């Protein structure tokens, strides 16, 4: 049986769906008759947070959780970055950073960790979906000083991933804008219809791997 790990945030976890059976992770497993593992935790970021969040679980960044994944998966999908833009306080950094002190460095560090446990052909990154207010330099409104907009986070993630010749599966255009979209519940999180759409896109992609 095919085994697939999904490392992500609240979208992967299934926030704003009506139940586990409506999450894209569950649906992919059902549609492919595969074992899918949901390593999504709401509020989490790829990069470590400097200032502690109200809930400790929100600070379990992707790097920490990647180390706790079951390593026998056939494929690993990493779906994140929107919270780094939204409310992450790690400096953005630059391409070439190798330590997780910056967003760029955390992406690089995560890739190198995954490459120690999986072949690069098994790893796929999913850039952030569109979201409401994605052009605001203040993220979700919690930033006290302006920073990069979502597109800059997404573009640099793609650039770093591609520099390792690792696959990117980008479904943001197929999913459409975060606002005034029947696939989204609140401008950020897809609803049941949105998760069904993501599952269908992922299944089509996985079948071609």
PLM features: residue spans?
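Ser/Thr-glycine-rich phosphate-binding loops at phosphate-binding pockets of nucleotides
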Residues: 9-12, 191
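Residue-level preference for alpha-helix termini and adjacent loops
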Residues: 10, 45-46, 182-183, 187
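Residue-level detector of flexible, active-site-proximal loop/helix-junction positions
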Residues: 11, 42-45, 130, 175
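A short, surface-exposed helix-loop junction/capping segment
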Residues: 7-8, 138
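Alpha-helical cap/lid subdomain in secreted, periplasmic
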Residues: 60-209
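Conserved SGNH/GDSL esterase-like catalytic core that processes O-acyl groups on lipids
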Residues: 2-5, 13-101, 105
């Amino acid at each position: 049986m095919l085994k697939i790990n999904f490392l992500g945030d609240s979208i992967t976890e299934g926030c704003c769906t009506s139940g586990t059976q409506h999450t894209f992770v569950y649906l992919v497993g059902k549609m492919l008759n595969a074992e899918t593992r949901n390593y999504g935790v709401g509020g989490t970021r790829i990069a470590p947070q400097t200032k502690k969040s109200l809930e400790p679980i929100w600070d379990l960044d992707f790097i920490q959780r990647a180390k706790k994944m079951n390593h026998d998966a056939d494929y690993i999908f990493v779906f994140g970055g929107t919270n780094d833009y939204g409310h992450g306080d790690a400096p953005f950094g630059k391409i070439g950073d190798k330590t997780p002190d910056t967003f760029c460095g955390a992406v690089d560090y995560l890739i190198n960790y995954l490459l120690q446990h999986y072949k690069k052909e098994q790893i796929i990154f999913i850039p952030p979906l569109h979201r409401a207010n994605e052009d605001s330099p203040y993220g979700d409104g919690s930033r006290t000083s302006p920073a990069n907009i979502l597109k800059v986070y997404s573009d640099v993630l793609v650039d770093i991933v591609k520099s390792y010749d690792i696959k990117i599966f980008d479904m943001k255009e197929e999913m459409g804008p975060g606002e005034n979209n029947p696939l989204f519940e609140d401008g950020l999180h897809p609803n049941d219809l949105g998760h069904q759409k993501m599952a269908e896109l992922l299944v089509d992609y996985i079948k071609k791997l």
